[in-house]
Swiss-Prot record:
Reaction catalysed by this enzyme: octanoyl-[ACP] + L-lysyl-[protein] = N(6)-octanoyl-L-lysyl-[protein] + holo-[ACP] + H(+)
A molecular function GO annotation: lipoyl(octanoyl) transferase activity
Taxonomic lineage from the root: Bacteria, Pseudomonadati, Pseudomonadota, Gammaproteobacteria, Vibrionales
Miscellaneous section: In the reaction, the free carboxyl group of octanoic acid is attached via an amide linkage to the epsilon-amino group of a specific lysine residue of lipoyl domains of lipoate-dependent enzymes.
Species: Vibrio vulnificus (strain YJ016)
Subcellular location: Cytoplasm
Active-site feature positions: 168 (acyl-thioester intermediate)
TM spans (from-to): none
Protein name according to UniProt: Octanoyltransferase
Family affiliation: Belongs to the LipB family.
Residues annotated as binding substrate: 70-77, 137-139, 150-152
Length: 218
């Protein structure tokens, strides 16, 4: 199972049911469980990471705020943003947490490079940036040697809700998205490229795709 990956396209979902399903998957998986990546667009929501501080919520208005158990501070999820959750057995892949963070940043950088968008990671703030503007947020959690949570890549979305928070705890952090930089407006195209880069970086040899309707909305 080390080189097998299951890619599930969840479509558009509320945050909490997917978060609960990630927990259930991680709690019940064993050494034989293949790694999975879940691709989803969330309905509008602010999520606070474990390090989240209330003062970074400036004016959330009618958008709900959910306390999450991922790393990091507050961020926004909404339609037009590609969220990828990485359910990976790190011990099996012989990856440390820092290795996984670097791999995820590199797969985003490589994905954007396919669209002639130059981007980079920052040592002081996880995520991916284009000329100082943030295009991708990153937050993970590890349990039983397995990762969950993941990344949020701005593709073709309304960025204005980010003005209601200090994104990832940084006052005045400017956000940018793929479609503004000459890349695709279609999330499905970006999903394909992202999965391709992930398979290359982590050496998966068998990849199974599914449109997952069964993620339980507990």
């Amino acid at each position: 199972m080390q080189n097998q990956l299951v890619v599930k396209r969840l479509g558009r979902r509320d945050y909490l049911p997917v978060w609960q399903a990630m927990h259930e998957f991680t709690d019940t998986r064993n050494e034989e469980t293949p790694d999975e990546v879940w691709l989803v667009e969330h309905n509008p929501v602010f999520t606070q990471g474990q390090a989240g501080k209330a003062e970074h919520l400036l004016n959330t208005g009618d958008i709900p705020v959910v306390q999450s158990d991922r790393g990091g501070q507050v961020t926004y999820h909404g339609p037009g943003q590609l969220v990828a959750y990485f359910l990976i057995n790190l011990r099996r892949k012989k990856l440390g947490v820092r290795d996984l963070v670097t791999t995820i940043e590199n797969l985003v950088i490589n994905t954007l490079k396919a669209y002639n968008i130059d981007s980079a990671a920052r040592p002081d703030a996880p995520g991916v940036y284009v000329e100082g503007r943030k295009i991708c947020s990153l937050g993970l959690r590890i349990r039983k040697g397995c990762s969950f949570h993941g990344l949020a890549l701005n593709v073709n979305m309304d960025l204005s809700p980010f003005l209601r928070i200090n994104p990832c705890g940084y006052q005045g952090m400017e956000m940018v998205q793929v479609s503004e930089l000459g890349g695709p407006t279609d999330i499905a195209l970006v999903e394909q490229q992202l999965v391709k880069e992930l398979v290359n970086l982590l050496g998966y040899e068998q990849v199974e795709f599914s449109t997952e309707a069964e993620v339980r909305e507990a």
